[in-house]
C-alpha cells in the first residue's frame, strides 16, 4: 500500500507514468538479485499494477548434484515445491526479499532513484524541446561571467554573451522575455540556449501583442534586425479591410510601444511588404 501511494505521488508530482516506475522497480529487483547471487539471467519479476505487490522467482534446473545453487536445485528440494518434479525439469523458486540483504535492497532503491532522475530529465527535455523557437518569460538567476542564467520555471536556460544585446544589463530576480534558441539533451538535463538578439524574438512578441498577427490575418513577411538599435519588419494583410501596418502599430502606437519597451528602446520600423 505504501509503495502504491508513493508511485501515485510520483506520477502526479514528477509527471512520470506509474508503468515506467513499475518497470524501474522490476529492473531494480533483477539487479539486486544479480548483485546478491552473481547472476540474474534466470530471474523473473511479476508486479501487480493495482496493488504493487510483487514476487521474485528464479528458474532453476533440477539436478542430481547441484554445482551452481543460483541456477540449479536438487531433486529433493524441487519435490518439496512440486511433488511431480523430475531431473532436468525447470522449477520456479520464489526468492524472498529478505534474502537479498541490506546492500541489495539499497541497490534496488538506487536503481529506482536513478530511473526517476532519468525520466525527470526526459520529461523536462521533451517539455522544453517543444518550446524551441518560442518566447518565454524568465527570471534572471545570476550573472556568470559574461553569461546569464535564467530560470524558466522547471529548468534554467543560458543567455550567452553573443546572444545578448550590447550594453543590456541584467539583475538577479529581474523578469525578462527570451527566445528559446535551442534545447540540447545532456546527461545532466536539458541545456537550454536563449537569445535576446534573434529576429524570432521580435516576431513572437508581435504575435503575442497583435491579435491580427496571431490569427494569421496579418503576416510578417520579413524581419531585418540590428539588435539593440533598429528592427525593420515588412507586413502583409490577407484581409483587404485590415491595414497591416496600422494593426501592428496599434491605437496611438500602444502595440508597437509595448514591444519597444520590452526591447529596451530598440526602434522598430513597420512597412508594407512589397514583392
Regions found by a protein language model. Name each.
Residues 1-275:
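RNA-contacting regions in translation and RNA-metabolism proteins
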